[in-house]
Every structure is written in structure tokens, then in C-alpha cells.
Amino acid sequence: MARVKRGVTSHAKHKKTLKAAKGFYGRRKNTIRAAKAAVDRSKQFAYRDRKVNKRNFRALWIQRINAAVREFGLTYGRFIDGLNKAGIEVDRKVLSDMAIHEPAAFGALVEASKKALAYLKEAGTANEFESAVR
């Protein structure tokens, strides 16, 4: 059986690792051992931060919605509660975008939310409200 030398594959692996380490500072960009450790760590950070990114964007959307809704005299929580009671299903990303780019449409949603909250307050139950809306 022929002897298998793995120079080609290890060279390819090293080349791939060093390419991924391009732009790193110091030994991390040219020494394979340091580069491998740095690349592995960077992949862990990338994996973690893809999850964190989603949290950060949701928090940003909520802050924007809260700021826009307070101009109409509501808080974020009451606004979302009113939307749910009115049966309006719009996600936070779209609400945030509407608040910035389409203030008139966003204002209509705020008024619908206020109307739902006021009607429920005087009617008392959600079932009566849903039958009145339909």
C-alpha cells in the first residue's frame, strides 16, 4: 500500500485559516497556531453575536415605538395592549419603520389602539368589544 503524506491537505487547511485571519493584528495573522486560535475565537463571537444582534434590534425598535407613541400621550405597553385588543397584528419592526417614515399611518394605528382601550374600559369585556368591531 502506498504511503499517504498529508502535506497538500494540511497546507490547504493552513491557507484557509490564514485567509480567515486576514486583517488580524500581530502574530495572529501570520503564525498558524495563533491564527487558528484567533479564528476559532472569532467564530464563537460571531455565533454568539448573531443571537445578540436580534435582541439589540428588538430593543431598538421598542425604544423607537415608545418615543413615537409618547407624542400621542400613550406608553409603549398601553399601545401594544391596545393593538392586541383591537386585533391589529403588526410586528415591532414594521411599527418602528412606520413611526419614522409614515407618521400619519402610525398615528392612525395609535388612534385605533386608543379607541380599543377606551371602548374596553367602558364596555368591560373583550368579547363585547370583538363583537362590536366585527
Curated annotation (Swiss-Prot):
GO biological process: ribosomal large subunit assembly; translation
Stated role: Binds directly to 23S ribosomal RNA and is necessary for the in vitro assembly process of the 50S ribosomal subunit. It is not involved in the protein synthesizing functions of that subunit.
The organism of origin for this protein: Rhizobium meliloti (strain 1021) (Ensifer meliloti)
Family per record: Belongs to the bacterial ribosomal protein bL20 family.
The entry's keywords: Ribonucleoprotein, Ribosomal protein, RNA-binding, rRNA-binding
Signal peptide span: none
Record-linked InterPro entries: Ribosomal_bL20, RIBOSOMAL_L20_CS, Ribosomal_protein_bL20_C
GO molecular-function term, one example from the UniProt record: structural constituent of ribosome
Full protein name: Large ribosomal subunit protein bL20
Any single GO CC term annotated in Swiss-Prot or TrEMBL for this entry: ribonucleoprotein complex
